[in-house]
């Protein structure tokens, strides 16, 4: 019997990028038989990839024992005898290049993502303001170059995971619909002003028909506490649920509201409707949540701020662009949310 191919998939970071890879890996395994897939990623992203049936994860401690060149060589030594026949590099970073070079010495072939840097540069400088290939398609192209069929249009969403019992320590068992709101972003230029988001939260909290579940991280804790104490029917998950438990909760949301950030992609993994709010970045760069309706996008006013997108990741923006997201009215956010909640 022919031995199965064994692909080492490399994607070390970040949450959003990892989440985008999930439906691609599902399609890869659904559409190609006799195939093993192992993902090398940061330890904390392990639960994201473990949602894909048939995928193994080999976590890399790139801030610890696998840090630097010496650490990457150690990581290679730990996994080199796992029978990998090819490598799909979805990251295209210095770290992934080191791993590929070491495996190439063993005769393991590899293919690497084309990030479309030139196209993205033209998008930012305004010479080509048009839709670029999605990141999911760029990931799929890597596997296609290795000879595999990956048709994202035939993706099949799996059944929702079972809700952990712990969820009901923060959420009551009632008939309320669950709205996830991830109001924060790594860069301020991608974050909807909190005073405007509060108007959205206030509207839905007072109806008594919804439970608002806020998502955030360590630096957001004080604001999460303040918001949950200021508005009824509003809770947060940080420190109350583990990341794995959050991943089990998200598929059960009726709606997710997110910036151009990871939580929107985590919800899209499970076909949860996602309303995305965009600041100085733009969905044309290819980071739109997987298979979400384009009408669920709320964009900052490009007529008033014509340099949008000022960067791909939101890390660069002119000083006078700090208020771009104030051109998205709370009313427009509320209307879009109600449209989806009542569909």
Identify the function of each model-found stretch.
Residues 1-343:
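Catalytic machinery of carbohydrate-active enzymes
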């Amino acid at each position: 019997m022919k031995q199965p191919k064994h692909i080492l998939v490399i994607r070390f970071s970040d949450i959003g990028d990892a989440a985008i890879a999930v439906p691609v890996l599902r399609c890869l395994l659904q559409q190609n038989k006799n195939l093993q897939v192992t993902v090398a990623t940061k330890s904390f992203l392990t639960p994201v990839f473990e949602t894909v049936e048939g995928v193994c994860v080999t976590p890399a401690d790139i801030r610890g024992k696998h840090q630097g060149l010496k650490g990457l060589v150690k990581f290679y030594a730990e996994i080199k005898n796992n029978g990998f026949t090819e490598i799909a590099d979805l990251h295209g970073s210095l770290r992934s290049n080191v791993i590929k070079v070491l495996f190439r010495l063993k005769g393991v072939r590899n293919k690497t993502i084309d990030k479309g840097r030139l196209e993205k540069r033209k998008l930012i400088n305004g010479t080509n303001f048009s839709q670029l290939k999605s990141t999911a398609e760029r990931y799929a192209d890597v596997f296609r170059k290795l000879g595999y069929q990956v048709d994202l249009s035939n993706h099949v969403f799996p059944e929702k995971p079972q809700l952990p019992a712990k969820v009901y320590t923060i959420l009551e068992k009632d008939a309320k619909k669950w709205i996830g709101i991830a109001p924060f972003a790594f860069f301020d230029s991608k974050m909807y002003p909190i005073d405007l988001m509060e108007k959205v939260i206030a509207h839905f909290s007072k109806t008594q028909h919804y439970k608002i579940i806020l998502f955030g991280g360590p630096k957001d804790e004080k604001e999460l506490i303040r918001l949950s104490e200021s508005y009824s029917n509003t809770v947060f998950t940080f420190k109350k649920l583990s990341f794995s438990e959050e991943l089990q909760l998200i598929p059960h949301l009726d709606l997710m509201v997110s910036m151009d950030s990871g939580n929107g992609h985590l919800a899209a993994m499970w076909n949860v409707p996602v309303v995305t709010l965009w600041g100085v970045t733009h969905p044309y760069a290819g980071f739109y949540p997987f298979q979400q309706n384009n009408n669920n996008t709320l964009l900052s006013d490009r007529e008033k701020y014509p340099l949008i997108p000022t960067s791909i990741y939101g890390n660069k923006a002119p000083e006078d662009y700090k208020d771009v997201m104030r051109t998205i009215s709370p009313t427009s956010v509320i209307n879009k949310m109600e449209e989806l909640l009542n569909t």
